[in-house]
């Protein structure tokens, strides 16, 4: 009997299209003689197709394991992992807490540094605050604290207006 793998793709984040590409690669790489792949697409507006995964034990009898290929908010941030925990469904990847912590770049850098891992110099910019230039000079890479897949990254060669 084949293992029934639900691959979650799409989602409501700005990384929807990236998720679709990731899921396509995952599904193409799975051995069809061992796995029955069931694609679950979450639209940009949040509608599930073919149907939602129900957050209750035994509410998803046709799924053996879930492979979340979602990116960003509601995908990598612990949200969908929490839903899968409530649904009592095994899934691939990190759990709720690990997913949540790793989505926050500032927190993750602090955790890594506290554990003795090398971390490049950085500074946190908060909207509405006026800051001086970084002590480590230019160029710098600017990245949103809670997005993944390189979304929103820019390389600044000259000091931008700090906002």
Predicted segment positions?
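Glycine-rich phosphate-binding loop of ATP-grasp-fold ATP-dependent ligases
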Residues: 19, 139-163
